[in-house]
């Protein structure tokens, strides 16, 4: 099993630090990730079938050790039928984002189109209108020692940020656990967010 120190330094997975990219599924009240190996094994089947089977739910409780957090924007462009992503930065207030959409051109060839470039405050309107949202990108170590990336957006950003800000001094030494979901409501829209708590201190062998 990897230790927290090895995970921060890259360990055996330095070429591809995160093995899973997880996001919170509000309706299901759990995390999920897209399994590329499952998707590859289903090649040739309808896209809806692949999407349903390759999106793997991770039931609660969910435990992790915090490693680092960055910020980015991600989303989907209906106009270009492609994925919008940006570079990850420590702070969007003073570091530029380069927001790009990866899609296919009229000939069906893979290409990319720049959506916007600059500080988030300067490009926010262009980014949102293109179909992307602000994300908090949190790198963690899972119970099996593998590295994962938690991608928070919307209400999940607020929930994580509040937990981080009030307890960041403890994050280096304790396991975080999500055992349940918190119900929320904005206008007529109901949603859930993960409820973060500390479970236990890390052992000497895990540090």
Describe every region a protein language model picked out:
Residues 161-207:
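Long, compositionally biased interface segments
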């Amino acid at each position: 099993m990897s230790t927290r120190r090895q995970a921060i330094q890259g360990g055996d997975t330095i070429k591809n630090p995160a093995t899973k990219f997880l996001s919170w599924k509000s309706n299901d009240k759990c995390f999920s990730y897209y399994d590329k190996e499952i998707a590859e094994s289903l090649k040739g089947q309808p896209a809806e079938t692949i999407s349903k089977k390759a999106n793997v739910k991770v039931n609660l409780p969910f435990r992790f050790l915090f490693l680092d957090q960055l910020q980015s924007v991600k989303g989907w462009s209906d106009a270009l039928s492609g994925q919008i992503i940006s570079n990850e930065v420590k702070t969007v207030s003073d570091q530029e984002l380069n927001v790009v959409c990866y899609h296919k051109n009229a000939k069906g060839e893979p290409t990319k189109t720049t959506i916007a470039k600059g500080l988030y405050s300067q490009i926010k309107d262009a980014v949102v209108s293109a179909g992307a949202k602000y994300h908090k990108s949190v790198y963690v170590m899972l119970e099996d020692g593998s590295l994962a990336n938690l991608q928070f957006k919307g209400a999940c950003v607020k929930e994580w940020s509040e937990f981080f800000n009030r307890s960041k001094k403890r994050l280096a030494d304790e396991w975080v656990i999500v055992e349940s979901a918190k119900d929320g409501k904005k206008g007529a829209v109901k949603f859930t967010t993960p409820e973060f708590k500390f479970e236990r201190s890390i052992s000497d062998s895990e540090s």
